[in-house]
Swiss-Prot record:
Protein's UniProt name: Putative pre-16S rRNA nuclease
Compartments where located: Cytoplasm
GO BP terms in the entry: rRNA 5'-end processing
Disulfide bonds: none
SMART domains to which the protein is assigned, alphabetical: YqgFc
EC number of the protein: 3.1.-.-
Classification of source organism: Bacteria, Pseudomonadati, Pseudomonadota, Betaproteobacteria, Rhodocyclales
Gene Ontology molecular function: nuclease activity
Amino acid sequence: MGTVLAFDFGEKRIGVATGETMLCSAHPLTTIHAESNEDRFAAIGKLVAEWQPEQLVVGLPTHADGTPHEMTRLATKFGERLARRFNLPVSFADERLTSLDAEARLRETGRNSKSAKPLLDAVAAQLILQTWFESPHHVIPTQPSA
């Protein structure tokens, strides 16, 4: 397949990770800090142009029992916009506990919460992508719509 970009969607920040399907390994890339959707999608557009992914993955937040909540709806809407805007397939991957896992991983590297904050969302996106690589049966694909 090729390159994949993954997103940890948030209302204030979007973490981004990249990976290769041949290696099934994910790496944190960046965190997008943008107020408006226009600025967010412009930044994502630059990443799509640079990395030329064949697939996009969006973390799908849910309650611990798997039931949806407001951020589930917003992340789904974000994924649908990605599919339409970039004409790329988008999959949703379970992101339960990825932020906690990302915090723990950054603490293990000796970073305190303040110094780790800029990396947190990108590491969460990395974990989302790694989950997608390891658990293809847990993804919910969507194709770009006209």
